[in-house]
Amino acid sequence: MASMLVQHSVKDFAAWKKMYDSVADLRASSGELSDQIYRDASDPNKLTAIFKWDSLANAQKYAKSPELKAAMEKAGVEGPPNIHFLNEV
């Protein structure tokens, strides 16, 4: 199973979360199986997300999608995200 780990900061967590939740169907239709969101203990606007995907190819395709880029901009993501693709062992 493939995973995608994403880290970024946001301007406002509540605004980001609203936008994040609004694209849940897009993520699912792209192959996302599950997600976990974490907030940094010292800065609640620093986020780490771990997503499980049906395939590495779908995770990589979604990460490059214009829909994701637009959603991140609208949600107030600050700077480019750090994205890592992982394979479960």
Spans of model-derived segments:
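Short S/T/G/P-rich N-terminal loop/turn motif that feeds into the first structured element of a domain
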Residues: M1-E67, K74-V89
